[in-house]
Amino acid sequence: MADGNEDLRADDLPGPAFESYESMELACPAERSGHVAVSDGRHMFVWGGYKSNQVRGLYDFYLPREELWIYNMETGRWKKINTEGDVPPSMSGSCAVCVDRVLYLFGGHHSRGNTNKFYMLDSRSTDRVLQWERIDCQGIPPSSKDKLGVWVYKNKLIFFGGYGYLPEDKVLGTFEFDETSFWNSSHPRGWNDHVHILDTETFTWSQPITTGKAPSPRAAHACATVGNRGFVFGGRYRDARMNDLHYLNLDTWEWNELIPQGICPVGRSWHSLTPVSSDHLFLFGGFTTDKQPLSDAWTYCISKNEWIQFNHPYTEKPRLWHTACASDEGEVIVFGGCANNLLVHHRAAHSNEILIFSVQPKSLVRLSLEAVICFKEMLANSWNCLPKHLLHSVNQRFGSNNTSGS
């Protein structure tokens, strides 16, 4: 469960309400780290991860695999949905994306080791219960691994790096064994710099022939897609947690290393990197080489090639192996993760808290809705004059008691 050996919205109508599914509305999901979270811009879907066993103390356990938690980014409400079908095993360190409201899940680490299985779940389904489907893809798959990254471009999912088993088939790229894994596992593992493409129309795996200087093998790094560039920052390789920044041109498959001007974030793994505009990435948290959890946030300006430290109110809330998703309202929603040294298992402080970072100016609609809510007593008699979809938004917000980050 560690970072090596520790290791535009489619329209202006309301999105799917998920009210028709068999569900259970609770306050929030359990605390966790190593989970996945993806977004359709209005909802954040959370699956998997693990937490400490509160009864036995020294043991970690994976969260229930059937549970899919959906966070409404507008109202701040959580909903739990119990999924069915080819449900993936409970895992940590998996890699997930959401494309056109379809969730794709690859890799991870479960109770029997690493996996390279691929799953999908269509959140647009009209069935009463959301169904997982395991896809038997064509071509040579990536090796079994966790803590890898992914870029989404056109009809392709492009996976990079990770920590796991030696590939069984010949692949392009470098694999470096972790010597310490020979002592504590019958299946030694290591880091890699492999690039694998999955075509989501044919479900076929392939590898591109890349040019330029590739990044070193790594795991627990962070990836983000902007245009035709797949960015990767940091991650762990052997005993170092790095702060290098690279991008892969997803048309030409050429690697480029970026040397930003001025100050840069310290090296880290288990951090998040989120695209927030066509020119900016948002970096938060992580874990340093000297095993310190981080609470700093940065924005990277692509056109200026520079990092800028981002001021925020959560400096006393470090997070590592958390998740971060961008909303349609210019916010980054951070969920879960660990607040201290994750490697001291019996003391790991896993979180289930939401941290909200406003990284873009709020829209006029959002500002107007907040004003209506602020002066609700004064304006209540005029609510029926609002368009139906805005009235729906106001009513939903009144039903929420989650004001974190506002």
Curated annotation (Swiss-Prot):
It is found in: Nucleus. Coiled coil: none annotated. One of its GO terms (molecular function) is ubiquitin-like ligase-substrate adaptor activity. InterPro entries: Kelch-typ_b-propeller. One of its GO terms (biological process) is ubiquitin-dependent protein catabolic process via the C-end degron rule pathway. Changing K147A: Strongly impaired ability to recognize truncated SELENOK or cleaved USP1 with a diglycine (Gly-Gly) at the C-terminus. The keyword Calcium does not apply. Keywords: Kelch repeat, Nucleus, Repeat, Ubl conjugation, Ubl conjugation pathway. Changing S269A: Does not affect ability to recognize truncated SELENOK with a diglycine (Gly-Gly) at the C-terminus. Kelch repeats lie at residues 31-85, 92-136, 148-207, 221-259, 271-311, 322-359. Changing F182K: Impairs oligomerization of KLHDC2-ELOB-ELOC complex. The keyword Cytoplasm does not apply. Autoubiquitinated by the CRL2(KLHDC2) E3 ligase complex. Changing S406G: Promotes oligomerization of KLHDC2-ELOB-ELOC complex. Abolishes the activity of CRL2(KLHDC2) complex to ubiquitinate SELENOK. Component of a CRL2(KLHDC2) E3 ubiquitin-protein ligase complex, also named ECS(KLHDC2) complex, composed of CUL2, Elongin BC (ELOB and ELOC), RBX1 and substrate-specific adapter KLHDC2. May form oligomers as a KLHDC2-ELOB-ELOC complex; this interaction is autoinhibitory for the E3 ligase complex as the substrate-binding site of KLHDC2 is blocked in the oligomer. Interacts with CREB3; interaction is direct and specific as it does not interact with CREB1, ATF4, ATF6, JUN, FOS, CEBPA or herpes simplex virus transactivator VP16. This is Kelch domain-containing protein 2.
